């Protein structure tokens, strides 16, 4: 009853969203419910940032669409460091979602807390809407615009030329740049 959208990402193939049914990811719980067990499995599906490139394989965000209720959940991790997104099966045929910063299992990171100390993981933004992907993305876009801090660049935007994104692959020369700057 739930579709999960996974945002694959790589060097020259950014933001490649793939749609999976939760059952395809083995998040459908147990086949027999209520017979000498609690009726859900311990399976999980997760993806995370890797190394120093936080968007190396995936974007730090996700979408879950409930086909029965018509609700769509969209979320993002608000950190350029390590992060983890985890879906799993829960009681009653439900799914759970965990969004966090670095973890010991995936990133080799942990923090020991002394009595009375606390730790806050990375922030996340989320929205729930009736409807599909377009209303969900629109809601997250409104959120991003609302939380973005004002800065002088809002009034005077400079031109930034990224030669990696414009086919020079880190080997710019004045001549190469002149040939493509006006086209960019």
What role is predicted for each listed range?
Residues 127-139:
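Short, Lys/Arg- and Gly-enriched loop/turn segments at beta-strand edges
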Residues 111-130:
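Short Pro-Gly-centered flexible turn/kink motifs
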Residues 80, 126, 164-166:
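Active-site beta-loop-alpha junctions enriched in small/polar residues
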Residues 1-91, 107-109:
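Polysaccharide-binding surfaces and accessory modules of carbohydrate-active proteins
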Residues 95-105:
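Short, structured beta-strand/loop micro-motifs enriched in basic residues and often containing a Trp
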Residues 137-184:
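An acidic-aromatic substrate-binding cleft motif
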Residues 104-108, 177-178:
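Short alpha-helical segments and helix-capping/turn motifs at coil-helix boundaries
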Residues 72, 118, 158:
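A residue-level signal for beta-strand positions that form part of recognition/binding surfaces
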């Amino acid at each position: 009853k739930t579709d999960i959208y996974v945002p694959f990402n790589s060097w020259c193939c950014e933001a490649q969203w793939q749609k999976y049914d939760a059952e395809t990811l083995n998040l459908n719980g147990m086949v027999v419910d209520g017979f000498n067990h609690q009726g859900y499995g311990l399976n999980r599906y997760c993806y995370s940032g890797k190394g120093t490139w936080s968007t190396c394989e995936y974007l730090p965000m996700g979408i879950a669409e409930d086909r029965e209720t018509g609700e769509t959940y969209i979320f993002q991790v608000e950190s350029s460091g390590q992060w983890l997104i985890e879906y799993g099966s829960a009681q009653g045929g439900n799914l759970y979602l965990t969004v966090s910063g670095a973890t010991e299992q995936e990133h080799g990171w942990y923090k020991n807390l002394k009595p009375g100390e606390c730790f806050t993981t990375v922030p996340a933004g989320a929205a729930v809407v009736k409807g599909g992907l377009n209303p969900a993305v629109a809601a997250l876009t409104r959120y991003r615009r609302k939380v973005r801090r004002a800065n002088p660049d809002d009034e005077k935007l400079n031109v930034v030329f990224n030669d990696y994104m414009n086919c020079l692959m880190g080997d710019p020369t004045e001549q190469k740049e002149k040939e493509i700057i006006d086209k960019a």
